[in-house]
């Protein structure tokens, strides 16, 4: 499958923090959830995609274009939404629409009007008077109205209530419905992403922990409860806890609860390690995020 965004071996060093090496692929036509704790490196990665800051190493291809050598051509096809964007100096919503429209020959007036109506933002409203959530909606309207091939959103649901989130994700689903557009979302709204994102990547302390289809990520992980007999000894428990793909949730005496990555730590291995009374339960994306994030 062609990639809308392909990152290979990306690194960036700061005092006290190193990003990468990062490998990340957003398939064409996908809604990709890019998740991780605060300070994990999500925004830094997005900044580097847009050439804000110099990477130490690695390659970034956006729609087959080098993100630096082909910067102008790239930015003509990539939309961006962030809570940090400030359109207040343009006064009213209609005025900033006219300003941004002038940069994009592909601007669709009818689509813009539709988005304004669906997301409940008025052209005559003063931007300074908009709520924080409404300003996020305005950023999304300005990014979607010229129908970019790739849309990159940094925390797009911050400040939105449940209904507004549904409206925003509904419009994103429509935007990628033809399979020719792709979306990368950096977000903490994991419950939303589980419903809408078909691919997910998790970053922690500057490193990618996993990446793949959302369904596969959820399917390959389980919350597992088990018992280790008192004759197993502390070394056996320590060995289980240190296995790749095992994330300890709780231990009380000889009773354990762990998150298992069945690809690297299958249930059969757990049985062979002496575990008994094994029960398993499916995991949500949020449970997966919390479990891996606390390790």
Walk through the language-model features, giving the residues of each.
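ABC transporter nucleotide-binding domains
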Residues: 2-7, 12-185, 190-204, 209-210
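C-terminal coupling/interaction segments
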Residues: 254-295
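A structural detector for beta-sheet-dominated domains
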Residues: 8, 27, 227-229, 261, ...
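Short, surface-exposed beta-strand/loop "edge" segments at domain boundaries and coil↔beta transitions
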Residues: 151-156, 233-234, 264-268
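Alpha-helix N-cap/helix-start and coil->helix boundary motif
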Residues: 11, 94, 190, 231-233, ...
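ABC transporter nucleotide-binding domain
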Residues: 169-262
